[in-house]
Amino acid sequence: MKNLYQILCDEIEPWRKSRYQSQFSEVVEILKFNKNESNYLRTAQFNAIETYLFLRFVKETPKIIDLYKEYFKNLEDFVEVLGIKHINQYNIRFFETLDDVLKDLLNPGVADQYKYDALTETLNLDYPSYILALAMGSGKTNIISAIIAIEFAIAIANENKKSEFNFIKNALVFAPGLTILKNSLKNIALLPFAKILPPHLLNSFLANVKYTFAGDTDRLLVVQKESQ
């Protein structure tokens, strides 16, 4: 059985062949620019950004549990892919729906015995949460910077259009320590954005973006009023 990532790859393939059809033309432009003209991003970096944009602008930012429900509708597959150990071929008949399985995970006795805390926390997040896992040295900081630039550029391009899409206007990036903040994270502002964004999107992005690097004693961050 394929895992979630493999299924997403299968879903992205026809989207790629359709030349990235999207309700937002900027998504198409940016992906084509990076794939056919810029060639700045490594293959793994481009694939990560491509997957992210598919989830954001095609699937419209689903929660993780919604993805699992969509792609693993069969109870046996759902239980297997999530690594739920206490439900097996003998007792699965007592569960009628996927929600029955999720409800059972919250049973204190079951959760404690099978150590489902991390799983239930992930599945019950009330916001979308994605992990783009790449090897050390593969350029994760550049991916973060590129995603921020792409999100902001699309938001700016559509700010005067009537759309109910939840555009991003602020991004908060955490670092595990001051060493990472000083030596790596500040490179977010140094990405050659001309190699990520087409010229007509680049200028408006550069004119509007503002970076704030918080110190270890800072308690407040200044953001645009009523921005998301």
Language-model features: locations:
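RecA-like P-loop NTPase motor core of helicase/translocase proteins
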Residues: M1-Q228
